[in-house]
Amino acid sequence: MPLEIADALSFFRLSCGRWTSQRSQHHLLHRRAEAGASFIVVEELHKGDARLAEIAQRNNESVERIVGGCWVRWSGSMAWDRAGESHEDQTMFGLIPSDDAGRSGLLLRDRGYAEKAPVAGQFHMDAENGLILTTDYEMMSSLERFWFAGPNLRLRTSTVQGLSNNASCLLYTSPSPRDRNVS
């Protein structure tokens, strides 16, 4: 049963904390699947945080429109990694709602996944309180859906069209909501 989530900012707040992720990535061109795992830390960025002003400036948006956001750090590995290959990085998100309910709008990032330039995606929440994110890059586009199957279980599906043409399914688990606190 989906969790009741009022808006995208509430969805982000539920995502804050420490998570372990299991991933299955399907490389359509190679007709092969690759497994991976990550440790992820998500921290809330409150309205007025200087990092949100930085995201707004990089995306040519007004900081006054941003209602909040997150700072995300991760460390992981994939089955096909070469020696010394690292999957450690971080990014920041800022939310700009386009409706009064805060369930659709722009998701600003300081940089994209594949491209290191700032990027803005369109988000909306569906009837099951899943967060749908569509991001268009110069050479590709991605469609992602994030949702909570319970307070300690978050899921994500992702389809990338363009250079890599892959599909992913991710499972995020956390011990309990109170254990997700990041200090």
Predicted region positions:
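Short, hydrophobic/aromatic-rich segments at coil-to-beta transitions
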Residues: 17-18, 69-71, 103-106, 126-133, ...
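Short, surface-exposed coil-to-beta transition loops
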Residues: 35, 88-91, 116-119, 140-143, ...
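Beta-turn initiation residues at beta-strand->coil junctions
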Residues: 23-25, 135-137, 158-161
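Conserved small/polar residues in nucleotide/adenosyl-binding loops
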Residues: 172-177
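Amphipathic/hydrophobic helical signal segments and adjacent flexible N-terminal regions
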Residues: 1-102, 114
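Mixed-charge, glycine-accented linear interaction segment located at domain edges/termini
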Residues: 139-152, 159-163
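Short, exposed beta-strand/loop patches in secreted or surface proteins that constitute
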Residues: 94-99, 121-126, 146-147
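Acidic, glycine-rich flexible loop segments
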Residues: 108-142
